[in-house]
Amino acid sequence: MSGRGKQGGKARAKAKTRSSRAGLQFPVGRVHRLLRKGNYSERVGAGAPVYLAAVLEYLTAEILELAGNAARDNKKTRIIPRHLQLAIRNDEELNKLLGRVTIAQGGVLPNIQAVLLPKKTETHHKAKGK
């Protein structure tokens, strides 16, 4: 018979996201759209959103790992803003990067000036020895 039917043309390949091609969890397509809509420049290269998504994913993973450690130190299983604050402020580089950022419900780092701490007196021990 005449071979018109389902056999002829090539089957279209399953769509693969740019995030999965780059091995990322963050959405490369969304980052690309936001770069185009944000009036940062007239044109956006193909590699720029991939790179930016990778940087954002790395920073997020770093902060979440440190916040998870802070939560575990406080015997908690859920990360709260306080744990994020402790993680960022105790890390020198993240603190520098996010120095001007305020985290809602984050609180402050516990800090007591050395001058205000009680003095360890040596005279007390010497008096007992005499």
Curated annotation (Swiss-Prot):
Its main location: nucleus. Coiled coil: none annotated. The modification Phosphothreonine is found at T121. The modification N6-(2-hydroxyisobutyryl)lysine is found at K6, K10, K37, K75, K76, K96, K119. GO terms for cellular component: nucleosome; nucleus. SMART domains: H2A. It comes from the Eukaryota. The modification N6-glutaryllysine is found at K96, K119, K120, K126. The modification Symmetric dimethylarginine is found at R4. InterPro entries: Histone-fold, Histone_H2A, Histone_H2A/H2B/H3, Histone_H2A_C, Histone_H2A_CS. The modification N6-crotonyllysine is found at K37, K119, K120, K126. The modification N-acetylserine is found at S2. Disulfide bonds: none annotated. Residues 1-22 are annotated as: Disordered. The modification N5-methylglutamine is found at Q105. The modification N6-lactoyllysine is found at K10. Belongs to the histone H2A family. This is Histone H2A type 1-K. The lineage of its organism: Eukaryota, Metazoa, Chordata, Craniata, Vertebrata.
